[in-house]
Amino acid sequence: MGIIAHGIDLVDFPRIEDMVKRHGERFLDRVFTASEQQYANSNKNGIEKLAGRFAAKEAVLKLVGTGWRGKIAWTDIEVVNTETGQPQVKLSGEVKKIADKLGITQISVSITHTANFAIASAVALAESNGHK
C-alpha cells in the first residue's frame, strides 16, 4: 500500500463560530452530517470539534484534487471517531466516485487543535504505486 496524495488545512475557530452564528442550521446541515453535529453538540468544545472536521474535509478535498465545487457536497465527507477516539473518514457521493477513480483505498486523517486553530492532515493510500 502506498501514499498517492496528501492534503492539509488550517481553520480558525472564529471563522466557524461566525458561520454558525450567521447561518445557523443552514450552515450546519450543509457542511456537517447529523452524526458530526451530534458529536460537536455533545462536547464542551463544540466549535473546536466542528473546526477540526471542517479542516479534515478541506484536506480530503485537496488530496482528491477538486476543492469544493461542482456536484461535491460537504457531507460527501464524514469524519467519525473510532472507539479509541481516532478520526476516520467515510466517503460517499461524488467524492467517493473521484476517490475510487484515483484508486484510493484508504484515507488516513489526523486532526489537532491549538488555542485558536484546528489543523487537519489527510493522506490517501492505494493498493500499489500503479494506481489509476
List each language-model region with its residue ranges:
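Core catalytic alpha/beta fold that binds nucleotide/phospho-ligands
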Residues: 1-132
